């Protein structure tokens, strides 16, 4: 993605086993910092990248903020592992931005709310909220079905397929960790 956009990475971290040799060579040469790992290891590249980003944020005295794309590589098993990694790093204010949707991980120890009504094309869009920790408590305003300090079951379906109806729409995570998906209108997640 960075290669195609012509954006050079600050840090390259991983084994480069899921990109072409050309892109791997470019990433290794372009990054200011290049941290390589063997392809056979006991952690995913995402887990290593989060640790690397946490270290870099601490070195800079900055708060950890993660924005990702192509995070799952199109694999359903990776989707669940990605959400698990982001739940374990709830302070990271994580965002996954894809063509058809955006996902934010909310938690009181990181970004606790998302003003979804501020997003371009949000009005009328589908919004789903899924608890990534037991006993997650959320509020939703400006959606077709609103919730007020409602406790959610881990991976339960209470927050699935809501609709943004007001420009002031907001989702707040009071306790636990929450994945909030804003699905772009006309898009389907495959």
Annotate each predicted stretch with a short phrase.
Residues 14-16, 57, 88-92, 117-119, ...:
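Short, surface-exposed linear patches
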Residues 18, 36-39, 91-94, 121, ...:
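Glycine-rich loops and low-complexity Gly/Arg-rich segments
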Residues 89-104:
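Short, acidic/small-residue loops that bind anionic groups at enzyme active sites
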Residues 1-91:
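Acidic/Gly/His-enriched mid-domain segments of enzyme catalytic cores or analogous surface patches
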Residues 3, 7-9, 25-30, 47-53, ...:
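Low-complexity, flexible helical/coil segments
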Residues 99, 106-190:
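Long, charged alpha-helical interface segments
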Residues 69-71, 97, 130:
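Short beta-strand segments
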Residues 16, 38, 98-100, 133:
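Residues at the C-termini of beta-strands that transition into short coil/loop
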């Amino acid at each position: 993605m960075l290669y195609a956009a012509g954006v050079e990475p600050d840090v390259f971290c991983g084994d480069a086993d899921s990109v072409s040799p050309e892109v791997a060579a470019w990433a290794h040469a372009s990054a200011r910092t290049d941290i390589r790992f063997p392809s056979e290891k006991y952690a995913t590249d995402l887990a290593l990248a989060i640790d690397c980003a946490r270290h870099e944020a601490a070195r800079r005295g900055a708060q950890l903020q993660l924005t990702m794309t192509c995070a799952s590589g199109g694999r359903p098993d990776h989707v669940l592992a990605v959400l698990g990694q982001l739940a374990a790093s709830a302070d990271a204010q994580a965002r996954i931005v894809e063509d058809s949707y955006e996902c934010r991980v909310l938690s009181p120890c990181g970004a606790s709310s998302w003003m979804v009504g501020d997003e371009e094309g949000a009005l009328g869009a589908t919004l789903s909220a899924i608890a990534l920790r037991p006993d997650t408590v959320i509020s939703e305003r400006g959606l077709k079905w609103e919730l007020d300090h409602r406790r959610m079951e881990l991976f339960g379906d209470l927050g699935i397929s809501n609709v943004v109806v007001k420009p002031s729409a907001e989702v707040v995570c009071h306790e636990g960790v929450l994945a909030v998906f804003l699905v772009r209108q006309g898009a389907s997640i495959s």
